């Protein structure tokens, strides 16, 4: 199975990884894992004076902070995983990557906001569900 794990470094990411760890059938060399972290692009005044190379380094460093404990999780279990930093609209970037990689499943944590909050503000999980053609498993 080709599994994409969308991570953001939040406690919900930790819960998702915990769920994967507790369910042995999710782990193993028979699966292919891609771990993605998506960052919205810096725009406006903050981005205008920054060298594009420096900006890419900033995005990469932020993603590495999120990836570090997850990379350790996979390495401790002897499981290979591909780590990808995406820069763009978060939900759209995650959904497109899952489709591009022909993933069988996209797994992500969810904050579990209520209907009203999602209706007014939206959420990454809600947007991924709406825009992704790949099956999505939300862990709360």
Residue ranges of model-derived segments:
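Short, flexible loop segments at boundaries between secondary-structure elements
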Residues: 134-140
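Glycine-rich, Arg-bearing micro-motifs that act as flexible, cationic patches
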Residues: 105-130
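Small/aliphatic-rich secondary-structure junction motif
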Residues: 1-49, 77
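Structural beta-alpha unit
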Residues: 72-106
């Amino acid at each position: 199975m080709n599994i994409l794990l969308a991570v953001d470094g939040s406690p919900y990411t930790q819960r998702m990884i915990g769920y994967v760890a507790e369910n042995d059938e999710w782990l193993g060399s028979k699966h292919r894992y891609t771990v993605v972290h998506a960052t919205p692009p810096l725009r406006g005044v903050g981005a205008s004076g920054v060298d594009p190379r420096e900006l890419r380094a900033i995005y990469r460093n932020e993603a590495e902070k999120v990836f570090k404990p997850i990379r350790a999780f996979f390495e401790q279990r002897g499981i290979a995983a591909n780590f990808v930093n995406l820069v763009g609209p978060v939900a759209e970037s995650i959904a497109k990557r899952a489709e591009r990689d022909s993933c069988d499943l996209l797994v992500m944590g969810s904050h579990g906001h209520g209907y009203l909050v999602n209706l007014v503000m939206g959420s990454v999980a809600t947007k991924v569900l709406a825009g992704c053609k790949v099956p999505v498993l939300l862990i709360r």
